[in-house]
């Protein structure tokens, strides 16, 4: 057992440092092509690259380990200190992805067929997950790899609506202007704004505003973007109509949308992950997350789905991303135990 653990940790160190050295912000996933070709050859896992999103699919089978290869922008030089690995994506989500790749390799060596994906664009508009749902893959079970502290099983995510608003007005000299588009729209923003408070209450948050071209002329045009988040028990149309009513004189456009997801705590993936953690004397927690993930998209394929992964979720998107080799090992072990159970029951 100790020998297996050291083998996994050594392989995880090698692969994760290699992958962290490759800068893959969203839409730049092709930078990792040679890495996945090497994995395919070394671990004898068939490689398929989805043509539209440049997502990477390894292996075969009806069980999918799905993580993502893209990261938020901002390269961090990878390093290792005392079995702690630092780098952009160490937590979100190259650490979980490496755990999944190693688990898939070891499972396939045992004759248990499992696929693993390094999906593209999860940090943006999830074009990788969306392309996967359009392919003829038939997955009975999906485990989504995101950092969940190595103990948490995510069974619910909120949905999101990305909304562009374009407003126009007559420009005037600022010294004698009777109206001002910035002032008028700012009042409406304050009226419609819903601060993120708790999971069950929707949030409407302005994230971008642009207007004006000259120091002494009021703006003729204004661009505004809202990031709307809502739980499965909130009414999507009511939120959109509330914003439309407030900005009646402006043009509105939904530029991206992700539905909320909530799965049964009794579905096979949740139950197998729970038992996998208990077998390691780790107390599992069922949690819900305020953001979104590829699970929101992949729920279209199967209801036997949940999210789990190694890594401290508080470090996501920060410049302090780090993960320990022990965390990755627990991730590998959990994925393997869960899939072995799912395989036996299939």
Curated annotation (Swiss-Prot):
An annotated GO cellular component: cytoplasm
Protein name listed in UniProt: [LysW]-lysine/[LysW]-ornithine hydrolase
Keywords associated with the record: Amino-acid biosynthesis, Arginine biosynthesis, Cobalt, Cytoplasm, Hydrolase, Lysine biosynthesis, Metal-binding, Zinc
InterPro entries (UniProt xref): ArgE/DapE_CS, Bact_exopeptidase_dim_dom, LysK, Peptidase_M20, Peptidase_M20_dimer, Peptidase_M20A
Cofactor binding, per record: Binds 2 Zn(2+) or Co(2+) ions per subunit.
Stored HAMAP family: LysK
Gene: lysK
Pathway: Amino-acid biosynthesis; L-lysine biosynthesis via AAA pathway; L-lysine from L-alpha-aminoadipate (Thermus route): step 5/5; Amino-acid biosynthesis; L-arginine biosynthesis
Organism: Saccharolobus islandicus (strain L.S.2.15 / Lassen #1) (Sulfolobus islandicus)
Organism superkingdom: Archaea
A biological process term (GO) from this entry: arginine biosynthetic process via ornithine
A molecular function (GO) term: cobalt ion binding
Catalysed reaction equations from the record: [amino-group carrier protein]-C-terminal-gamma-(L-lysyl)-L-glutamate + H2O = [amino-group carrier protein]-C-terminal-L-glutamate + L-lysine; [amino-group carrier protein]-C-terminal-gamma-(L-ornithyl)-L-glutamate + H2O = [amino-group carrier protein]-C-terminal-L-glutamate + L-ornithine
Subcellular compartments: Cytoplasm
The protein's role, per its UniProt record: Catalyzes the release of L-lysine from [LysW]-gamma-L-lysine and the release of L-ornithine from [LysW]-L-ornithine.
Assigned protein family: Belongs to the peptidase M20A family. LysK subfamily.
Active-site positions on this chain: 70, 122
E.C. number(s) listed in UniProt: 3.5.1.130, 3.5.1.132
Transmembrane regions listed in the UniProt entry: none
Positions annotated to bind Zn(2+) 1: 68, 92, 146
């Amino acid at each position: 057992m100790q020998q297996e653990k050291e083998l996994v940790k050594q392989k995880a160190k090698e692969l994760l440092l290699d992958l962290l050295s490759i800068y893959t912000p969203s839409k730049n996933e092709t930078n990792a092509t040679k890495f996945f070709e090497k994995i395919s050859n070394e671990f004898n896992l068939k490689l398929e690259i989805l043509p539209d999103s440049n997502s990477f699919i390894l292996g075969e089978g009806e069980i999918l380990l799905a993580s993502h290869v893209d990261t938020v922008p901002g390269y961090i030089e990878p390093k290792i200190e005392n079995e702690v690995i630092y780098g952009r994506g160490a937590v979100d989500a190259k650490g979980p992805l490496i755990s999944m790749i190693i688990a898939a390799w070891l499972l396939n060596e045992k004759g248990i067929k499992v696929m693993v994906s390094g999906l593209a664009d999860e940090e943006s508009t999830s074009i990788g997950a969306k392309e996967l749902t359009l392919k003829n893959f038939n997955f009975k079970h999906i485990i989504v790899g995101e950092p969940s502290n190595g103990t948490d099983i995510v069974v619910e995510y909120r949905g999101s609506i990305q909304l562009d608003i374009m407003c126009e007005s007559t420009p005037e000299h600022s010294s004698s202007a009777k109206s001002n588009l910035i002032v008028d729209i700012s009042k409406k923003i304050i009226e419609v704004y819903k601060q993120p408070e708790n999971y069950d209450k929707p949030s409407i948050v302005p994230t971008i505003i642009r207007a004006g071209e000259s120091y002494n002329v009021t703006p003729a045009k204004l661009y505004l973007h809202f990031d709307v988040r809502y739980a499965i028990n909130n009414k999507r149309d009511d939120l959109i109509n509330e914003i439309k009513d407030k900005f009646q004189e402006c043009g509105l456009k939904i530029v991206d949308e992700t539905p909320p997801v909530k799965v049964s705590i009794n579905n096979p993936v949740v139950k197998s992950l729970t038992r996998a953690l208990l077998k390691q004397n780790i107390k599992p927690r069922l949690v819900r997350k305020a953001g979104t993930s590829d699970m929101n998209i992949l729920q279209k394929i199967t209801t036997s789905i949940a999210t789990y992964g190694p890594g401290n979720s508080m470090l996501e998107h920060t410049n302090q991303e780090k993960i320990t080799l022990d965390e990755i090992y627990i991730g590998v072990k959990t994925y393997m135990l869960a899939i072995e159970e799912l395989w036996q029951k299939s």
